[in-house]
């Protein structure tokens, strides 16, 4: 089994959801970002999404757009992001790590080279928001052939006619964007999320992770009762943006991660 399959299976046995954390690689700089990345598992992150910085992150809200700007300003690129994964893997062989971003940097790096280097570095999955299933042959198929999961986003506007197509070729888990729009937007209602999860379960056996708008341990716990994974990104990145030092950035992110993890872990305890 892949690291993602193993982790979600373990958590199912424990009757709890995964805490999935998102940070942008190289934000605010390489060393601070690597320290955050290395600290996330001990702070309670079950799965890590690592953003690949890009100049035009159109699906992301202001917090992650600014994170991209900070990372690019610190000279982060795809090669350095893969190096960061390699350094993370030197001390962690079991936490699933997923790269998330846009196709443009991968295209410029070269798809075959990227897949080979990502696999060698220890990448477990990809979320590429601007690669619809109609283009599976360009990245999804070769990535999966190399043993890298390809995770799809679904949204409130993905109707029943479109959903099977979106899920075609998906692996690892399904990422449900609970608010239509950009990342970090307002939280969805629990009733809406519950209905969406039920609809997705009719179409797939993959674990379902919910993201966009989750900022507090209480919100994370509420989602953890309904879904297999709880994704938090913008709330963590806000701590990097407001930090006055590298130490403050690391401490702020890891402290919030620990609080979110506690919320997720207690969510299903009666």
Swiss-Prot record:
It catalyses: (1S,2R)-1-C-(indol-3-yl)glycerol 3-phosphate + L-serine = D-glyceraldehyde 3-phosphate + L-tryptophan + H2O. The active site is at residues 49, 60. Keywords: Amino-acid biosynthesis, Aromatic amino acid biosynthesis, Lyase, Tryptophan biosynthesis. Pathway: Amino-acid biosynthesis; L-tryptophan biosynthesis; L-tryptophan from chorismate: step 5/5. Its EC number is 4.2.1.20. GO terms for cellular component: cytosol. The alpha subunit is responsible for the aldol cleavage of indoleglycerol phosphate to indole and glyceraldehyde 3-phosphate. Belongs to the TrpA family. This is Tryptophan synthase alpha chain. It comes from Pseudomonas fluorescens (strain ATCC BAA-477 / NRRL B-23932 / Pf-5).
């Amino acid at each position: 089994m892949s690291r993602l399959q193993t982790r979600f299976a373990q958590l199912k046995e424990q009757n709890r959801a995964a805490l999935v954390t998102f940070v942008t690689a190289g934000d605010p700089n390489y060393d601070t970002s690597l320290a955050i990345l290395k600290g996330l598992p001990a702070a309670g992150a079950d799965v890590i999404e690592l953003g690949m910085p890009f100049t035009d992150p159109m699906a992301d809200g202001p917090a992650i757009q600014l994170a991209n700007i900070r990372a690019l300003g610190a000279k982060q690129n795809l090669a350095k992001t893969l190096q960061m994964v390699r350094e993370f893997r030197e001390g962690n062989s079991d936490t699933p790590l997923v790269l998330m971003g846009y196709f443009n940097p991968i295209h410029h790096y070269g798809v075959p080279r990227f897949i080979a280097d990502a696999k060698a570095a220890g990448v477990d999955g990809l979320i590429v928001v601007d690669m619809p299933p109609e283009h599976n042959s360009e990245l999804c198929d070769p990535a999966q052939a190399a043993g890298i999961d390809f995770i799809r986003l679904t949204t409130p506007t993905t109707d029943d006619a479109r959903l099977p197509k979106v899920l075609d070729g998906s692996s690892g888990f399904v990422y449900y964007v609970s608010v239509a729009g950009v990342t970090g937007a307002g939280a969805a209602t629990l009733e809406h999320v519950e209905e969406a999860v039920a609809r997705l379960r009719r179409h797939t056996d993959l674990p379902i992770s919910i993201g966009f708008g989750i900022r507090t341990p209480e919100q994370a716990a509420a989602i953890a009762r309904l879904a297999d994974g709880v994704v938090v990104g913008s709330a963590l990145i806000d701590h990097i943006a407001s930090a006055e030092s590298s130490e403050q950035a690391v401490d702020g992110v890891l402290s919030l991660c620990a609080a979110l993890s506690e919320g997720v872990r207690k969510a299903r305890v009666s």
